[in-house]
Amino acid sequence: MSAQQLEIEDLIRKLGKEILPEHAKLLLFGSQARDDARPDSDWDLLILLEGEKVSNEDFDRWVFPFISLGWSLGVEINPVVYTYGEWQQRQITPFYKNVMREGVELC
């Protein structure tokens, strides 16, 4: 990973620790997690929250700050958010399997 990529990862981690609820998880997945990203590659994030269902308010509160951070850094940050229960229901999907295999927990 380049120095710039390490700096971006650190800023994402710090933001997650600042804003996410205590029992939330933040995972990096995709090319940045696999360390095969190109300079123009985006940053794929998975946010896992407690609760029954993700609401529009959850999206605004937990997802938008990461998108905004990407804008300020000139990179694309693409967070997806699920509750732990919703995420477990996706266990049979290739997406779930890929994230669980290659994901890097940031906080």
For the regions a language model picked out, list residue spans one by one.
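Short beta-strand->loop micro-motif that forms the acidic, two-metal-ion catalytic signature
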Residues: 44-48
